[in-house]
Amino acid sequence: MALEKELVTLTKKWFIDRDLEHGGRLDKQALKLSEEFGELCAGYLKQNEKLTKDSIGDCAVVIVGLALLIKEDVHSIFEESDNIRRKDAMDCFKLLNANISEFQLSQELASKEMCRHNLVRAVAYLKSISKALNYDFTDCFELAYNEIKERKGRWVEGSFVKEEDLPNE
């Protein structure tokens, strides 16, 4: 649990250091979460443990950014997620998909509290998927953080693009 808190803090700092508040857009970051969820589904379906673990962590990283964009306490979102548990991986995939979609649909229509609720549940389902697959959620999160911690790039129309993916200018 201490490592998870540290990873949340480090990931928050990563986003802040890259000026998420002025460069990031909620709609684009929500779409990024869908992209990472798609990779998680692909990893699971192909029984690719490395991709699955990496994608669980990548989803957690994006959720930190989303929480910052809606100006919510990221630590409390991750802590509250421990109160929700499911056992069946497929149920968790369905529920996570629904939560991501609901977040995207409600970001302009619903209250900030509803957006926060969807993030809490998304983290909970990621943790439940990890447990169902006999992975350690914190290990997955750490794997993803270690991959991005030195990453350079810039915000392009609200989405962070890593340096190697930027078009030649």
What is the role of each PLM region?
Residues 1-169:
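Flexible "arm" and connector segments at domain edges
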